[in-house]
Amino acid sequence: MKGKIIPLNFQTRQDSETGHEVIRMTPPHIICHRNYFYQKCFTRDSSKLLFGGAFEGHWNYYLLDIPGQQAMQLTEGPGDNTFGGFLSADDKSLWYVKETRELRRVDLESLEEYVVYEVDDDWVAYGTWVANSDCTKLVGIEI
C-alpha cells in the first residue's frame, strides 16, 4: 500500500577481512535490491535511499529513511521495473517504468502518480531511462 511505513532493524557486523563495519539495512527474509548504479538513488543530503523490495509479494519502490530506520512504500501493484527508477535532482519525484509501457513520475510528497510517456503498442520500454544531472532531459530505450 502506497505510503505504508515499514519499520526496519538495521543489523551491524564487522567484516572479517577488512575490519570495517557492515550495515544490513533491509530484513534478511525479504528480497530487496538497489537500482542501477548510474541512477540517482540517494537524496542530496544522503539521508534517504531508493530501493526495490518485495515486501508485498511483488516488486515495488521504497524510500529508506536511513536515520529513522524505516522505509516508505512509493508504488504498489505488479509491473514495476525496480532496477531503472531514479530520484529527480530536486528529490521531489521518483521516475520509473510500469508494465514495460509507461514512464511514470511519483510525487514523493503526495504519492500521486502521473503517466509521463506511454510507449506505442509495437514497442516495449526496456525500463532504463536515464536523466541528465538536473533532470531536464531523459533518454529511454525502446525495443
Language model feature labels by segment:
Residues Q39, N60-Y62, E102:
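Conserved beta-strand and immediately adjacent loop positions that scaffold enzyme active sites
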Residues G79-S88, K92-I143:
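Asp-box/WD-like beta-propeller blade repeats and closely related beta-sheet repeat scaffolds
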Residues I23-I31, Q70-E76, E112-D120:
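A short beta-strand motif characteristic of beta-propeller blades
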Residues H33-F42:
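Signature of short aromatic-glycine-proline-rich micro-motifs recurring in repeat-based ectodomains
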Residues M1-I23:
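Blade/loop signatures of beta-propeller domains
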Residues I5, A54-W59, Y96-T100, I143:
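Short, solvent-exposed loop/turn segments at conserved positions within beta-propeller repeat blades
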Residues H20, F37, H58, T82, ...:
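Short coil/loop residues immediately preceding or within conserved phosphate-binding loops
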Residues Q14-T18, R44, K48-G77:
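Beta-propeller domains
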